[in-house]
Amino acid sequence: MNAEASWIIKFLTRIRDMRVVWDVMGSLYNRAIHDVIAALYDDIARELTVPQKAHVLDVGAGRGYLSLAVAAEHPDAHVIGIDYSIRQVRAAEKYRLQRVVDNCSFERGNAMDLQFPDETFAAAVSVGSIKHWPDSHRGLTEIHRVLKPGSCLIIAETDREATDEALTDFVKRFRLCFVPDRLHFWGLRHVIFGQSFSAEALADAVADAGFRDVKCLRVPTCPYVIVKAWK
């Protein structure tokens, strides 16, 4: 890759992570992504180990799809979803009211500085968020701090090592009406997936933050990786 292309990718990655982009474009992304990875949300909700009447944290909740899936799967728990985009928080709360879910709430928050006391939560989840964090280690150590001992963490992210075949299939399902498929593929390959985590890198990042019994799997239904670990 030449220097010009590398500069463009770095520039687009910075734009990708800006709060204003998610304030403006979040609703479009929400509509486009839901059906593509809905099964992933449900799988995580079922896989998450949640004690009775526990508090669960969703970091980077977006419109709240995963938070509501966890709330439905664990009806005696209370899920708190945070996002650094206030418009995403408002969209999530609106969606929660539409779905009439009482054991879930949303608030603005920053993964770099979680505004919760130590050992507040008994489980935590995050999907598609960590690649946007300015310091993934700091964010993961913040999650570790607010979890009780013995708590479960599940985090999923786009797979940096996804094959061209898997990514092409993803493009076919994740349509953006105003973006040609070839440009969409390039953007996903170099800006979204290419600036994300491999399975090994994500597992190592979670372990480096102090989590134990780290297990990492690729997802058969979409080119994501999942890490499950314990505090």
Segments (PLM) and residue ranges:
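A short glycine-rich, Lys/Arg-flanked "PGG" loop and its adjoining helix->strand segment in the class I
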Residues: H137-P149
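C-terminal lobe and adjacent flexible extensions of AdoMet/dcAdoMet transferase-like proteins
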Residues: I226-K231
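Class I SAM-dependent methyltransferase SAM/SAH-binding core
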Residues: H55-L57, R63-D113
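Conserved class I S-adenosyl-L-methionine
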Residues: M1-V50, Y65-A69
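A short SAM/SAH-binding and catalytic strip from SAM-dependent methyltransferases
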Residues: A123-D135
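Short glycine-centered segments of the SAM/dcSAM-binding site in methyltransferase folds
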Residues: H55, S151-C152
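C-terminal alpha-helical "lid/dimerization" subdomain adjacent to the S-adenosyl-L-methionine
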Residues: I9, A156-A209, D213-V219, P223-V225
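A short acidic, Gly/Pro-enriched loop at the edge of an enzyme's catalytic core
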Residues: M112-A123
